[in-house]
């Protein structure tokens, strides 16, 4: 049986030494899968884990920086200082929501127009929306130009002021104007224009009532609380711009009558006179008598101030005589200047003229050039002496002088 299988005998005769030096390529292909995977991914695991994390963080920072550059300028200026990553992501989310809402609104408008329906908004509101959109585009272009060519940064105060001003103007332009009735055209106060012009231009609008008496001729009005120059147009109200410092309108200066007028104290001088010990405030100036003394310096003593005295500036030397010890003309004015004051203010003649029953009491005192002196010799006056002429004038005596025009010689 063994003879029938010759190859079996030959296999049994083979020993281990017979296999030395033979090359079997199939033996090298039998490798485990784990070793093959390690060989293929050896280059991937060469870098440490911290370098991989650094690359990942760098990619995140690069994307956030690109988002920051793509954000509009008005969103960047809402936060002062450095924009953090979380702030950039929040602003990006806010901007995307606004764009989504705008896109949805435009899509609804397009569908409404395709279906033949009318616009959801009135034409005026649609125009305001279009203007607001164009205004925002122009403001964005201005900010980009300033940042590119003028080197403006969002951190600068002037850039923040410009954005605030543009936002105020856009807000006011979108506010609907309330129409005023009866044809009174009141000009609205522009908040944006007031913010741009500065503190000296900031003012409050005060409507001024027109003089509508029939038959009045237009004349130049010099009152301080008048909002127009005298030529008042019928049927239209004027608007006056007053400085913000005054909480009340400026008081009018009392006009002096030609005959029998009493000098009332100006309200602007009452505070200073009371503070200096001049007495109580003048609640009713016409009820109390006025003492009108004169302190006249000699021309030689007041020669150094005489070249600066002018008729137009004498009214600032007038003080109410009831606030003693202040005289009527203060500080001392020479006799020539007093005569000039009397000539500049003719209304003082009726006040300074003595009543008939008191003419004898002031016979020896010097009189001004425009008054009629009573009969009697005048006493000489020393060169450096003062002459005090106190005289009280009551409202009753002033009324009596007004009824006797012959005694008021100009």
From Swiss-Prot:
Q: Which top-rank group of organisms is this from?
A: Eukaryota
Give any single GO term for biological process: negative regulation of DNA-templated transcription
Q: Where is this cross-link: Glycyl lysine isopeptide (Lys-Gly) (interchain with G-Cter in SUMO2)?
A: 31, 121, 240
The listed locations are: Nucleus
Pfam name, any one: HLH
The Orange domain is annotated at 131-166
The UniProt keywords, alphabetically, are: Biological rhythms, DNA-binding, Isopeptide bond, Nucleus, Repressor, Transcription, Transcription regulation, Ubl conjugation
What GO annotations for molecular function exist for this entry? bHLH transcription factor binding; DNA-binding transcription factor activity, RNA polymerase II-specific; DNA-binding transcription repressor activity, RNA polymerase II-specific; E-box binding; histone deacetylase binding; MRF binding; protein heterodimerization activity; protein homodimerization activity
Coarsely, its chief localization is nucleus
Cite the CDD domains for this sequence. bHLH-O_DEC2 (cd19750)
Which tissues is this chain's protein expressed in?
A: Expressed in skeletal muscle, brain and lung.
What does its record list under induction? Answer: Expressed in a circdadian manner in the liver with a peak at ZT10.
Q: Carries keyword Cell cycle?
A: no
Region feature (Disordered):
209-255, 360-410
Signal peptide residues on this chain, from the entry's feature table: none
Chain ranges of the bHLH domain: 44-99
Any one annotated GO CC term: transcription repressor complex
Q: Which Gene3D superfamilies match?
A: 6.10.250.980, Helix-loop-helix DNA-binding domain
Q: How does it assemble?
A: Homodimer. Heterodimer with BHLHE40/DEC1. Interacts with CIART. Interacts with BMAL1. Interacts with RXRA. Interacts with NR0B2 and HNF1A.
What function does the entry list? Answer: Transcriptional repressor involved in the regulation of the circadian rhythm by negatively regulating the activity of the clock genes and clock-controlled genes. Acts as the negative limb of a novel autoregulatory feedback loop (DEC loop) which differs from the one formed by the PER and CRY transcriptional repressors (PER/CRY loop). Both these loops are interlocked as it represses the expression of PER1 and in turn is repressed by PER1/2 and CRY1/2.
User: What is the protein name for this chain?
Assistant: Class E basic helix-loop-helix protein 41
Organism the protein comes from? Mus musculus (Mouse)
| Lineage summary | Eukaryota, Metazoa, Chordata, Craniata, Vertebrata
């Amino acid at each position: 049986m063994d003879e029938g299988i010759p190859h079996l005998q030959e296999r049994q005769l083979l020993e281990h030494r017979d296999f030395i030096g033979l090359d079997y390529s199939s033996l090298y292909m039998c490798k485990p899968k784990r070793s093959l995977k390690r060989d293929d991914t050896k280059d991937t695991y060469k870098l440490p884990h911290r370098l991989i994390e650094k690359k990942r963080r760098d990619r995140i920072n690069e994307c956030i920086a690109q988002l920051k550059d793509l954000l509009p300028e008005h969103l960047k200026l809402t936060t002062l200082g450095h924009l953090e990553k979380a702030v950039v992501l929040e602003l990006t989310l806010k901007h995307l929501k606004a764009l989504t809402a705008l896109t949805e609104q435009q899509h609804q408008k397009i569908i409404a127009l395709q279906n033949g329906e009318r616009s959801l908004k009135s034409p005026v509101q649609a125009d305001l929306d279009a203007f607001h959109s164009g205004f925002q585009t122009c403001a964005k272009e201005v900010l980009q130009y300033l940042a590119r060519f003028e080197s403006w940064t969002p951190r600068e105060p002037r850039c923040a002021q410009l954005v605030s001003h543009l936002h105020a103007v856009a807000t006011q332009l979108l506010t609907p104007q309330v129409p005023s009735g009866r044809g009174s055209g009141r000009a609205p106060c522009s908040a944006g224009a007031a913010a741009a012009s500065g503190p000296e231009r900031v003012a409050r609008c005060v409507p001024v009532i027109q003089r509508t008496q029939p038959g009045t001729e237009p004349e130049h009005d010099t009152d301080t609380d008048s909002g127009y120059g005298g030529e008042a147009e019928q049927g239209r109200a004027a608007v006056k711009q007053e400085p913000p410092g005054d909480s009340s309108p400026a008081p009018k200066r009392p006009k002096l009558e030609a005959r029998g007028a009493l000098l009332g104290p100006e309200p602007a001088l009452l505070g200073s006179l009371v503070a200096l010990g001049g007495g109580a405030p003048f609640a009713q100036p016409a009820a109390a008598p006025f003492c009108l003394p004169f302190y006249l310096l000699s021309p030689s003593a007041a020669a150094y101030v005489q070249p600066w005295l002018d008729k137009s500036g004498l009214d600032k030397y007038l003080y109410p005589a009831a606030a003693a010890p202040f005289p009527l003309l203060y500080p001392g004015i020479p006799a020539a200047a007093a005569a000039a004051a009397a000539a500049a203010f003719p209304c003082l003649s009726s006040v300074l003229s003595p009543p008939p029953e008191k003419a004898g009491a002031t016979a020896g005192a010097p009189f001004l050039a425009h008054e009629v002196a009573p009969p009697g010799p005048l006493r000489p006056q020393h060169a450096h002496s003062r002459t005090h002429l106190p005289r009280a004038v009551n409202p009753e005596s002033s009324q009596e002088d007004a009824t006797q025009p012959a005694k008021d010689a100009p």
